[in-house]
Amino acid sequence: MIKKTSGTEIRALARHIGMSAQKARRVIDQIRGCSYEQTLMILELMPYRACYPIFKLVYSAAANASHNRGLKEADLFISKAEVNEGVIVKRLKPRARGRSYPIKRPTCHITIVLSERPNFNFKNI
């Protein structure tokens, strides 16, 4: 995993995850804009195979935020989450009479960006 930071955003990137981008987007669309705790609950309860690598990536991004920036995990939310298509791993499956059929295994790249929620002070309003 490659981790990049810029400004107040914490970015985590997982590359070459062995699933199609369409199946990963189905999960990413559910967690975009949610808080960190709510995201972990959603990912634990969803029955899809894509949840586990996304769970690990969100957990890693939050650990980077608390360790490198000293941010509280309760104040974090997912400001940006995207899934891009990776390379297609091509294999050959042996078939009858010396033939072979191609097997195309898609991969994807998942990017999670965490930001800190702004704290509003209502005493000054």
From Swiss-Prot:
One of its GO terms (biological process) is translation. Its main location: plastid. Transmembrane segments: none annotated. One of its GO terms (cellular component) is large ribosomal subunit. It comes from the Eukaryota. Belongs to the universal ribosomal protein uL22 family. This is Large ribosomal subunit protein uL22c. It comes from Nymphaea alba (White water-lily).
